[in-house]
Amino acid sequence: MTRKEAEKELIAMLKEAEGGPTYSMEEVDAYMRELLHPKNQIYLTGDTHGQFERIISLCERQQVQPESTFIILGDAGLNYYGDRRDNRGKDKLAKIPITFFCIHGNHEMRPSKELGYQVKEYHGGKVWVQPEYPNLAFAIDGEIYDFFGYSCIVIGGAYSVDKYYRLARGYNWFEDEQPSDEIKEKVERVLSARDWKIDVVLSHTCPLRYEPTEVFLPMIDQSSVDKSTEQWLDTIESRLHYERWYCGHYHTDKEIDKIRFMFQDYALLPHQISLSAESAPSRR
């Protein structure tokens, strides 16, 4: 039973009760429990970079149910090395009986068949999954996922401002860190087919006009930073009718307009709204 279904049943009970039918306390209690403590919560947080202690602690405190999903908005730190060293983090999350849904960041490899991944269906879209870690789902850019009635498009990737620092010291840097032209075309094609209406955007970086300049690193010359992904997201955001936009990347927690930047904070994807083609508001 979803929270939306529980709410619907309770409303129906109240309406019918006006005409005489009665319901047992057990029936009412079951629906109330689902409303107050839903099993299918959708959690969100920002970059973890392989440090999962805070997520594990939250799951234990909240007694997160197996039906729940935990979205990490990029740079989860699970595909950094491309070898067995990545299994340390995967093993930790495998012990938590929920699904972790990871957006692609800029400090990690894109999953592939060469890394032992398989493409599977998940909430109406496609994800990469390793058979050894079935509860770790890696989102594919441009796919739309249905999280309990919410249409969510994923747009991962960003530019690494520490690119040359990494290259100079032999640290990993990934050439395909930003969305390719093919990915951009897919995103635009998918959104166009939906008349540019979506409930939620899940991205790693943000549209250019929303960049949190207050957290820019002072030693980085911003004129040398490739902002092509942010510029492109600007064009997407200006055309898109959406309810919420969640992103990570900047290691800050803040909210402006409908966009929420996430790092160590947590959010729950609401259950009660859905932006249909008929009810979508005009934002521009």
Can you name each region flagged by the protein language model?
Residues 25-35, 41, 45, 50-147, ...:
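Core catalytic region of metal-dependent phosphoesterases/phosphodiesterases
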Residues 91, 99-103, 118-123, 128-129, ...:
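Conserved beta-sheet core of the metallophosphoesterase superfamily
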Residues 2-28:
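Short linear interaction segments
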Residues 49-50, 77-79, 107-109, 157-161, ...:
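Short, solvent-exposed loop/turn segments at secondary-structure junctions
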Residues 34-43, 144-154, 200, 256-260:
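Beta-strand-turn-beta hairpins that frame and shape the catalytic cleft
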Residues 44-46, 70-75, 100-107, 139-140, ...:
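Active-site neighborhood of phospho(di)ester-bond hydrolases with catalytic His/Asp-centered motifs
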Residues 128, 134, 148-227:
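Active-site-proximal loop/helix segment associated with metal-binding centers of metalloenzymes
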